[in-house]
């Protein structure tokens, strides 16, 4: 019998996080900070690949679901799979929003809004670049994410 073992994604302890992350990455993922709009790594980045949690490596978003929303942060129409994210109400700063976090590492990623392209489901996942690591499509196998290669096919399906 061939049982494929589910990959485990874990959060490092605080000391290791501070060693491995930049100050901005730490503040965004661990302290719910927001990076500056338009002055971040992935806002205008459209290479084929996946975006994973900078803390745990959890696969979060596909480049083919990324779009230019004009908001200044990377925007996606949907996550790779809902099993890798969690959403919760966020009433901070006098606003009512839905926060998006990674499921296992509990990293703050950004927020989701219902003003995305209608033809792609109407959602806009507005995500901080500092919470992400990009893995190019041609590096997915090498980095241990080969299971996501079929999602780049024309008739892709959500996991």
UniProtKB/Swiss-Prot annotation:
Presence of keyword Oxidoreductase: yes
GO BP field: protein repair; response to oxidative stress
Xref: PANTHER family: METHIONINE SULFOXIDE REDUCTASE, PEPTIDE METHIONINE SULFOXIDE REDUCTASE MSRA_MSRB
Domain MsrB: 14-137
Species this chain originates from: Hathewaya histolytica (Clostridium histolyticum)
UniProt keyword list: Oxidoreductase
Organism superkingdom: Bacteria
Protein name: Peptide methionine sulfoxide reductase MsrB
Catalysed reactions, semicolon-separated: L-methionyl-[protein] + [thioredoxin]-disulfide + H2O = L-methionyl-(R)-S-oxide-[protein] + [thioredoxin]-dithiol
């Amino acid at each position: 019998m061939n049982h494929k073992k589910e990959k485990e994604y874990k959060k490092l302890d605080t000391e290791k996080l501070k060693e491995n992350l930049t100050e901005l990455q730490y503040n965004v993922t661990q302290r719910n900070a927001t990076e500056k709009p338009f002055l971040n790594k992935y806002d205008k980045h459209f290479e084929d690949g996946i975006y994973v949690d900078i803390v745990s490596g959890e696969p979060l978003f596909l480049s083919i679901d990324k779009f230019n929303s004009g908001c200044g942060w990377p925007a996606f129409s949907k996550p790779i799979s809902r099993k890798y994210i969690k959403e919760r109400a966020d009433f901070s700063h006098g606003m009512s929003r839905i926060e998006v976090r990674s499921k296992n590492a509990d990293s703050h990623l950004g927020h989701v809004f219902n003003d995305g392209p209608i033809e792609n489901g109407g959602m806009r996942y507005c995500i901080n670049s500092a919470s992400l690591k990009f893995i190019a499509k041609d590096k997915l196998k090498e980095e241990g994410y080969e299971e996501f290669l079929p999602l780049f096919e024309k008739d892709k399906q959500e996991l």
